[in-house]
């Protein structure tokens, strides 16, 4: 059970940090620009 809790907390933290950085810095790749 401890492993599950630690994994969940780690994923949540990484997700929050990723979204924070993503929203702070707008993506340079256009959404509908293809490659």
Swiss-Prot record:
The chain crosses the membrane at residues 3-23. Disulfide bonds: none annotated. Pfam families: PsbT. Its main location: plastid. Keywords: Chloroplast, Membrane, Photosynthesis, Photosystem II, Plastid, Thylakoid, Transmembrane, Transmembrane helix. It is found in: Plastid, Chloroplast thylakoid membrane. GO terms for biological process: photosynthesis. It is a single-pass membrane protein. GO terms for cellular component: chloroplast thylakoid membrane; photosystem II reaction center. It comes from the Eukaryota. Belongs to the PsbT family. PSII is composed of 1 copy each of membrane proteins PsbA, PsbB, PsbC, PsbD, PsbE, PsbF, PsbH, PsbI, PsbJ, PsbK, PsbL, PsbM, PsbT, PsbY, PsbZ, Psb30/Ycf12, at least 3 peripheral proteins of the oxygen-evolving complex and a large number of cofactors. It forms dimeric complexes. Found at the monomer-monomer interface of the photosystem II (PS II) dimer, plays a role in assembly and dimerization of PSII. PSII is a light-driven water plastoquinone oxidoreductase, using light energy to abstract electrons from H(2)O, generating a proton gradient subsequently used for ATP formation. This is Photosystem II reaction center protein T. The gene is psbT.
